[in-house]
Amino acid sequence: MLIRARKEASERGLIAHVARHDANILKFCSQCGVGKLVYVSSVHAIPEKPKGTEIAETTTFSPELVRGDYAKSKAMATALVLQAAKEGLNASVVFPSGIIGPGDLGKGSITNMLLSFLAGKLPLAVKGGYDVCTACKSNLR
């Protein structure tokens, strides 16, 4: 029970930190007249639908609807950005997946998956993914 409580406290701390950090960035954008904010979220912020369910655009983002600290922090930040957009901030959100590129240094989840696959420890791989440089360039257009 104590370990679970610590994990939940840690998770709450992460979500609170993300909320404060992103709220400050959004406040800065509004106060300084930033022309356009492009927030790079993640597919992990999108709640998973039950297997066999048709995928549709999601408009509700909440830490309670996703699993894992990273997903929860991205869902919270995405909700904050979308709320700021409703209040007048010119903002867009993109949801990349499987990005890999220069500077990864073998610590990212996609790199680890590829290394496991090449070492014969993973019998299959996820199709798709995008180069980080291509993703960044498309977000700026």
Write out the residue ranges for each language-model feature.
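A conserved pocket-lining segment of Rossmann-fold NAD(P)-dependent short-chain dehydrogenase/reductase
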Residues: 7, 61-65, 112-137, 141
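The catalytic Tyr-centered alpha-helix of NAD(P)H-dependent dehydrogenases
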Residues: 14, 69-73, 131-134
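Short, flexible, mixed-charge acidic loops at enzyme active sites
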Residues: 49-57, 107-116
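Conserved beta-loop-beta element that borders a ligand/cofactor-binding pocket
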Residues: 41, 78-102
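Substrate-access "cap/lid" subdomains that shape
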Residues: 94-111, 127
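NAD(P)H-binding glycine-rich loop region in Rossmannoid oxidoreductase-like domains
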Residues: 1-20
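Conserved catalytic Lys-bearing alpha helix of Rossmann-like short-chain dehydrogenase/reductases
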Residues: 18-25, 73-81
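Conserved Rossmann-fold NAD(P)-dependent oxidoreductase catalytic core, especially the SDR/UDP-sugar
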Residues: 13, 20-70, 92
